[in-house]
Amino acid sequence: MAIGVKRNAGSSSDGTEDSDFSTDLEHTDSSESDGTSRRSARVTRSSARLSQSSQDSSPVRNLPSFGTEEPAYSTRRVTRSQQQPTPVTPKKYPLRQTRSSGSETEQAVDFSDRETKNTADHDESPPRTPTGNAPSSESDIDISSPNVSHDESIAKDMSLKDSGSDLSHRPKRRRFHESYNFNMKCPTPGCNSLGHLTGKHERHFSISGCPLYHNLSADECKVRAQSRDKQIEERMLSHRQDDNNRHATRHQAPTERQLRYKEKVAELRKKRNSGLSKEQKEKYMEHRQTYGNTREPLLENLTSEYDLDLFRRAQARASEDLEKLRLQGQITEGSNMIKTIAFGRYELDTWYHSPYPEEYARLGRLYMCEFCLKYMKSQTILRRHMAKCVWKHPPGDEIYRKGSISVFEVDGKKNKIYCQNLCLLAKLFLDHKTLYYDVEPFLFYVMTEADNTGCHLIGYFSKEKNSFLNYNVSCILTMPQYMRQGYGKMLIDFSYLLSKVEEKVGSPERPLSDLGLISYRSYWKEVLLRYLHNFQGKEISIKEISQETAVNPVDIVSTLQALQMLKYWKGKHLVLKRQDLIDEWIAKEAKRSNSNKTMDPSCLKWTPPKGT
């Protein structure tokens, strides 16, 4: 065996090292067919703390270089501490045993004389790691036990080699869309999943991002995306210029550019076609008969080009938001989200996830009794339930009735199951709702429409029994089949009607959903314009408006600011009575045919509850 001089590779930069002895043994493996004739196995032993008997049994016990009076320097590679310009006094360390390509005799060598020279020429390279790089430390040397056998060392080397050879079989890293589903494809018939409605992606896997569904090509989507980006850059540049030219005032008037843009939009909307020609109608009918619901209807010439362009931008933005959610893993194929619900004579598409039990959520389609709100798994179960269900209206007390419209007050403590089912149903259409099961501290006001089959759910709102912040609404919902018919405003009006009876000033609990915020702003605007239309005095008080309408003063001020009716002049706050807005509101009220979509205070039979 050849024995050379070598420093341990695991020594620290300050010149300290472990004084372990390592002996490399050479072995011949004749069973391998690849021609490998030698393998090295490193066996660790105890270091300077070995007893004298073990030193006597060492194979190098008779070497003259191991004198106890003259310690020797071990050779090693240059470390960071030795590369510094300041001279370092060399320390002396006990000589280590290793293999050398030179003579078989050992000698003490001063490392300070050979700090730029390698100590030995190795006849074979060190074993490779699974990544193909040589080990830089003692990571591949087992120092846990001094009695490691030779067979275990060979087995370890073989496992390292096998693990390195298996790396080529690892699957490639998936990119982009493959990161959330590898086998997805667009559900539109005839679509190859190429392109995206936003023009920013190469592939799509949903109808919302399908160019073919929107009667476009992938190239057209890219051109539109470039046009949108260019318009956004121009708008941002113009906003910066406006900000630089403006002075900091409390109420900033519109700039000249904004006024010109408003006039331009008004002119573009005047160019709207009065109607479709006969050829266009035939073209639209042919398109509908050919593709049915698998393609978007043709939208050209239905409205002005400006409004159609706004709609296309909104579509692209919504598609981009959905794509981000999919890439983040929030929307995945096969996720436990109910897609549709069978509710009475309607089939409703859901908007958000609701925490129904897993055995129901995984179905994708839920069947629900529209009277007791019990949810079921199949049409057969629903049919059997409807045959024996005795409920035809919500539980609780009917506190309002005018015509076919009724409102029921349901106590969450007395009718816990019904209120929990109502909250789970509402979560399918509300994003910010967090109340599902703790319904006892709340009262629910359910609005229904009656016919010969029963009282059908229109919507509801809930409120705390004891609200310290005077919230008159905690959650409000209008069912999708009754939206855009005035029922949402009726629910809001009814909540303020209850506040008037309680002689309180109320406000909805925040945050509001997007549709809820639109409804409340429209209601506050209507209330203020009606009040100003009937007001004949010269001085007005926000507090008086609040007490008469039961609207919170903060909501009144924000609405006046949005209408540009609140000004600050010569140290005083002024409310401008804009007659143009009042006349516009009067004209809209005259055109409304559904005058019955209002709440009549005389039809309310209710007294405020005392305590809980």
UniProtKB/Swiss-Prot annotation:
Name of the molecule in the record: Histone acetyltransferase KAT7
Domain free text: The C2HC MYST-type zinc finger is required for interaction with MCM2 and ORC1.
Known partners and oligomeric status: Component of the HBO1 complex composed of KAT7/HBO1, MEAF6, ING4 or ING5, and one scaffold subunit: complexes containing BRPF scaffold (BRPF1, BRD1/BRPF2 or BRPF3) direct KAT7/HBO1 specificity towards H3K14ac, while complexes containing JADE scaffold (JADE1, JADE2 and JADE3) mediate acetylation of histone H4. Interacts with MCM2 and ORC1. Interacts with the androgen receptor (AR); in the presence of dihydrotestosterone. Interacts with CDT1. Interacts with MAP2K1 and CUL1. Interacts with p53/TP53; leading to inhibit histone acetyltransferase activity. Interacts with MIS18BP1.
Compositional bias (Low complexity): 43-58, 135-146
Gene that encodes it: Kat7
Zinc fingers (C2HC MYST-type) by residue: 366-391
Phosphothreonine PTM positions: 86, 89, 105, 129
Cross-link annotation Glycyl lysine isopeptide (Lys-Gly) (interchain with G-Cter in ubiquitin), location: 339
Entry-linked PROSITE patterns: MYST_HAT, ZF_CCHHC
GO MF annotation, one: histone H3K4 acetyltransferase activity
Residues annotated with N6-acetyllysine modification: 200, 278, 433
Gene3D superfamilies assigned: 3.40.630.30, 4.10.320.30, N-acetyl transferase-like, Winged helix-like DNA-binding domain superfamily/Winged helix DNA-binding domain
